[in-house]
Amino acid sequence: MIFDWGGTLTPWHTIDYAQMWRLVCEPHYPGNHEDRADAALAAENVLWEQARTEHRSASIFGVLERAGIEPTDALIASYLREWEPHTFTDPEGIAVLRQLRQREIKIGVLSNTMWPRSWHEDVFRRDGVLDLIDGAVYSSEIDWTKPHPRAFLAAMAAVGADNPERCVFVGDRPWDDIFGAKSVGMRAVLLPNSDVPTFADAQPDAVIGSLSELLPLIESW
């Protein structure tokens, strides 16, 4: 069982990225923090568009370099502090991960992310679930983003799986998650949210309204 992270293991939040960057930059660039924030947002948008259209990965440090912002420890601390409210693992997700572990089902994570592995592991450790995850792939560490098939194959390898037909992917994005997983032969479960665009060619094997519905679903398979 392989999960997306943002919007799946974490509840979906609508975020004002422009305001977030202003809050990050304000303590470190007095007098011109808005210009720095605008540059960071523009750089971030360019690299996310690259991920969407070319399936090429990027990192938060690439964003900062492109924006001309030095990644000091203090600035990174401000960035993580602003993001923290949006990173907490869904309590229903924690329960599902524990139930999967009890059933000896391998658990993986595959996330399109600009964050390094250590930041994600800090989040999972804080929420008490790091030891429940058998393997994880973060696009910041590889050349591709979802829905590129190699991203999904890398996630399978991370949990020691070699047969996609025995893997289930759970995600909130029809294009990145569902289409991508189905393209390599996985089953795919959609946990939709209203802010993510639909994609007609993405045909999930099931749609759930919450993670609490996942265990009864896979047991019916």
Can you say where each PLM-predicted feature lies in the sequence?
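N-terminal helical cap/lid subdomain that shapes the substrate entry/recognition surface
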Residues: 1-103, 116-118
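Asp-based, Mg2+/Mn2+-dependent phosphohydrolase catalytic module
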Residues: 1-3, 34, 94, 98-101, ...
